[in-house]
Amino acid sequence: MHGSATDPLVYPHPTTPQPGELTEVAPGIQWLRLALPFQLNHVNIYLIAHEGGWAVVDTGIGDDKTKTTWDNVFNGPLKGTKITKLIITHSHPDHLGLASWLVDRAKCQLVMSQTEYFNGMYFNSRRTEGQIADQADFYRRHGIGEE
């Protein structure tokens, strides 16, 4: 069942979850939508049943709002459930941003490619005043406010 590039999008799930709400999209797969503070206003995170707990795919951005959302998920629908591993798909900050925090909190294994790991480390280490100003300008141009 393949369409053409001009066919309308077909969404496999009838509703979009609210930010911070877990939604089962298939047996053993949960969808978690996390808010982002820019024009692209969310990132999709997935939890896959694994070894009696959940393997988490990506983390959301590294800010306090996202940490609070994760805390609510851990204290609500995932209460008493183990996170078995964290899988990072790529080193963009909305996918990798809370990796260290989540691994520390869940005491789980981190899984990601070596290339993406080094990309993330490289961009995180380049914190000069000029680089921070360049990043701030980039994010402003893409819809993030001054705060």
Predicted region positions:
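N-terminal presequences and immediately downstream first alpha-helices
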Residues: 1-14
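A generic secondary-structure micro-motif detector
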Residues: 10, 60, 88-89
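Charged, low-complexity surface patches
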Residues: 14, 37, 91-92
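Amphipathic, soluble alpha/beta structural segments
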Residues: 14-15, 100
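Conserved beta-strand hairpin/beta-sheet module of binuclear metal-dependent hydrolase folds
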Residues: 19-81
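Active-site HxH/HxHxD metal-binding segment of metal-dependent hydrolases
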Residues: 71, 75-147
